[in-house]
Amino acid sequence: MAADEVAGGARKATKSKLFEFLVHGVRPGMPSGARMPHQGAPMGPPGSPYMGSPAVRPGLAPAGMEPARKRAAPPPGQSQAQGQGQPVPTAPARSRSAKRRKMADKILPQRIRELVPESQAYMDLLAFERKLDQTIMRKRVDIQEALKRPMKQKRKLRLYISNTFNPAKPDAEDSDGSIASWELRVEGKLLDDPSKQKRKFSSFFKSLVIELDKDLYGPDNHLVEWHRTPTTQETDGFQVKRPGDLSVRCTLLLMLDYQPPQFKLDPRLARLLGLHTQSRSAIVQALWQYVKTNRLQDSHDKEYINGDKYFQQIFDCPRLKFSEIPQRLTALLLPPDPIVINHVISVDPSDQKKTACYDIDVEVEEPLKGQMSSFLLSTANQQEISALDSKIHETIESINQLKIQRDFMLSFSRDPKGYVQDLLRSQSRDLKVMTDVAGNPEEERRAEFYHQPWSQEAVSRYFYCKIQQRRQELEQSLVVRNT
């Protein structure tokens, strides 16, 4: 579809430009061989050994976790969140969080944008992609809403009613040739039909009745009827063959197959609303418009309608609920009138006018409806767009890692001693967290640590707790001995 290709092509072009900018540094509008100049100190290679943090300090053996602090591993098939008693996110929640994470991962940090001014071109492309996605999503919602409503257009269906006469042949051997007969054909086609798939003629009708002259063919053989059933096979036309050598007057009654069904309004309601034949929803909407125009809705209770004299004559009540209108409309809606065509089946060989044409209005599906449905169901470019998204995320992640390495190298080059000290302090804090060690072993091993004012109070508290603990043990032992 054209709209699908345009939308998919626009998204692919945006993704390609984003990826080309990130990988090669090519700005939109720059020659393919041009590259962005990099500023600042050179970045270190990926996976630099300076980036790793040792698990423990040099000279210390790996400390094991206290047995009381150890937690049993969750059973197989159970996530860490389940082991901790937290609810496991459902698949839609994981999908939404992954989408939010991916959108955040696409944005370059401000520090990188300051280092590389040309990265603003990438941010502009990212903003354009976001606007494009919003426009496509808004259009998809509009199309979904439009598909919920009937989409019909008026077209002209041309009917061809023709007949042929076969005179009797005295020397014919079979019985069919020895008797004169005529054949009536009813066919038709849409005028100016742009669709490639031609619609069958019978698909426009719910029923077809051909009424012949009762005086010629009797009361039991003068009607030819066709009615649609769930198993009906569509056809391009109808044929009726009867014996006879006299001109016959016939009446064709054609009932159109309305989708959605339409009804003929009661004459009083038709005059009130200005409608003759319409669908039920259109009739209810027109009735509500009449109520609003004439201010018939109750000012205190909006659920009720106070009828005027015409309203009361039609619905036979002065006041009713609006929810009762669909039920009361049932008695006021009649089957639509059939199309009536009078035709003369001529058997006169000199009569050249044996084909009659009639144009009738029919409703057909909007051609755009199929294209709109195809647009909603199309996934032709989703895989390519997802692949480009993955490449962009990987490239952004690589850029962030290189930025961390650059900051490490730049800080180390400016103040090697201070940076190493800061790194050791940071790793020392990490070591405490990993080994669950409380306090500061480096300070605790020095005597000055215990000459601070808090030490006297700590000693008093310690001995007090020990005395209380010993007293409780003695009291328990005396109680046991006395019993």
From Swiss-Prot:
<dbReference type="GO" id="GO:0016514">
    <property type="term" value="C:SWI/SNF complex"/>
</dbReference>
<dbReference type="GO" id="GO:0045893">
    <property type="term" value="P:positive regulation of DNA-templated transcription"/>
</dbReference>
<feature type="compositionally biased region" description="Low complexity">
    <location>
        <begin position="78"/>
        <end position="88"/>
    </location>
</feature>
<dbReference type="GO" id="GO:0006337">
    <property type="term" value="P:nucleosome disassembly"/>
</dbReference>
<comment type="function">
    <text>Involved in transcriptional activation and repression of select genes by chromatin remodeling (alteration of DNA-nucleosome topology). Component of SWI/SNF chromatin remodeling complexes that carry out key enzymatic activities, changing chromatin structure by altering DNA-histone contacts within a nucleosome in an ATP-dependent manner. Stimulates nuclear receptor mediated transcription. Belongs to the neural progenitors-specific chromatin remodeling complex (npBAF complex) and the neuron-specific chromatin remodeling complex (nBAF complex).</text>
</comment>
<keyword id="KW-0805">Transcription regulation</keyword>
<dbReference type="InterPro" id="IPR019835">
    <property type="entry name" value="SWIB_domain"/>
</dbReference>
<keyword id="KW-0597">Phosphoprotein</keyword>
<dbReference type="GO" id="GO:0030071">
    <property type="term" value="P:regulation of mitotic metaphase/anaphase transition"/>
</dbReference>
<dbReference type="GO" id="GO:2000781">
    <property type="term" value="P:positive regulation of double-strand break repair"/>
</dbReference>
<dbReference type="GO" id="GO:0007399">
    <property type="term" value="P:nervous system development"/>
</dbReference>
<dbReference type="GO" id="GO:0042692">
    <property type="term" value="P:muscle cell differentiation"/>
</dbReference>
<dbReference type="GO" id="GO:0005654">
    <property type="term" value="C:nucleoplasm"/>
</dbReference>
<feature type="region of interest" description="Disordered">
    <location>
        <begin position="27"/>
        <end position="102"/>
    </location>
</feature>
<dbReference type="GO" id="GO:0071565">
    <property type="term" value="C:nBAF complex"/>
</dbReference>
<dbReference type="GO" id="GO:0006338">
    <property type="term" value="P:chromatin remodeling"/>
</dbReference>
<dbReference type="Pfam" id="PF02201">
    <property type="entry name" value="SWIB"/>
</dbReference>
<dbReference type="GO" id="GO:0051152">
    <property type="term" value="P:positive regulation of smooth muscle cell differentiation"/>
</dbReference>
<dbReference type="GO" id="GO:0006357">
    <property type="term" value="P:regulation of transcription by RNA polymerase II"/>
</dbReference>
<dbReference type="GO" id="GO:0045597">
    <property type="term" value="P:positive regulation of cell differentiation"/>
</dbReference>
<dbReference type="GO" id="GO:0000785">
    <property type="term" value="C:chromatin"/>
</dbReference>
<dbReference type="GO" id="GO:2000819">
    <property type="term" value="P:regulation of nucleotide-excision repair"/>
</dbReference>
<dbReference type="GO" id="GO:0003407">
    <property type="term" value="P:neural retina development"/>
</dbReference>
<dbReference type="GO" id="GO:0002052">
    <property type="term" value="P:positive regulation of neuroblast proliferation"/>
</dbReference>
<comment type="subunit">
    <text>Component of the multiprotein chromatin-remodeling complexes SWI/SNF: SWI/SNF-A (BAF), SWI/SNF-B (PBAF) and related complexes. The canonical complex contains a catalytic subunit (either SMARCA4/BRG1/BAF190A or SMARCA2/BRM/BAF190B) and at least SMARCE1, ACTL6A/BAF53, SMARCC1/BAF155, SMARCC2/BAF170, and SMARCB1/SNF5/BAF47. Other subunits specific to each of the complexes may also be present permitting several possible combinations developmentally and tissue specific.</text>
</comment>
<dbReference type="GO" id="GO:0070316">
    <property type="term" value="P:regulation of G0 to G1 transition"/>
</dbReference>
<dbReference type="GO" id="GO:2000045">
    <property type="term" value="P:regulation of G1/S transition of mitotic cell cycle"/>
</dbReference>
<dbReference type="GO" id="GO:0035060">
    <property type="term" value="C:brahma complex"/>
</dbReference>
<dbReference type="InterPro" id="IPR003121">
    <property type="entry name" value="SWIB_MDM2_domain"/>
</dbReference>
<feature type="modified residue" description="Phosphoserine">
    <location>
        <position position="178"/>
    </location>
</feature>
<dbReference type="GO" id="GO:0045582">
    <property type="term" value="P:positive regulation of T cell differentiation"/>
</dbReference>
<comment type="similarity">
    <text>Belongs to the SMARCD family.</text>
</comment>
<keyword id="KW-0804">Transcription</keyword>
<dbReference type="GO" id="GO:0045663">
    <property type="term" value="P:positive regulation of myoblast differentiation"/>
</dbReference>
<dbReference type="GO" id="GO:0001221">
    <property type="term" value="F:transcription coregulator binding"/>
</dbReference>
<dbReference type="GO" id="GO:0005102">
    <property type="term" value="F:signaling receptor binding"/>
</dbReference>
<protein>
    <recommendedName>
        <fullName>SWI/SNF-related matrix-associated actin-dependent regulator of chromatin subfamily D member 3</fullName>
    </recommendedName>
</protein>
<dbReference type="InterPro" id="IPR036885">
    <property type="entry name" value="SWIB_MDM2_dom_sf"/>
</dbReference>
<keyword id="KW-0539">Nucleus</keyword>
<keyword id="KW-0007">Acetylation</keyword>
<dbReference type="InterPro" id="IPR038043">
    <property type="entry name" value="SMARCD3_SWIB_dom"/>
</dbReference>
<dbReference type="GO" id="GO:0005634">
    <property type="term" value="C:nucleus"/>
</dbReference>
